[in-house]
Swiss-Prot record:
It comes from the Bacteria. Transmembrane segments: none annotated. It comes from Pasteurella multocida (strain Pm70). This is Thioredoxin. The keyword Transport applies. PANTHER family: GEO12009P1 (PTHR45663:SF11). Keywords: Disulfide bond, Electron transport, Redox-active center, Transport.
Length: 106
């Protein structure tokens, strides 16, 4: 499954109403660590296909959702399960640690 790009307008449909857990990445194009983990998120999306959906929200273009969830720095990864945020990771992680973060929380 490919990484899905969401917006404030589509957040509820893409994340809250998802039938599988969602790893939500808050990012911005100017953020170096965000760009660094982007290919890792692509790999995670492929490896966890069918088990976890990976969704990205650009905080420069969509400010309501990160404000609502209290995002203060990026990258911030929030894992949603059954429409609720169950775990948060602030900062970039290597792929193996990100996979462990997902497995521990789904």
């Amino acid at each position: 499954m490919e990484v899905l790009h969401s917006t404030d307008a589509t957040f509820t449909a893409d994340v809250v109403n998802s039938d599988v857990p969602v790893l939500l990445d808050f990012w911005a194009p100017w953020c170096g660590p965000c760009r660094m983990i982007s290919p890792i998120l692509d790999e995670i999306a492929a490896e966890f296909s069918g088990k976890v959906k990976v969704v990205k929200i650009n905080i420069d273009e969509n400010q309501a959702t990160p404000a609502q969830l209290g995002v203060r720095s990026i990258p911030t990864l929030v894992l949603f399960k059954n429409g609720k945020a169950v775990a948060t990771q602030v900062g970039a992680l290597p792929k193996n640690q990100l996979a462990n973060f997902i497995n521990q929380n789904i």
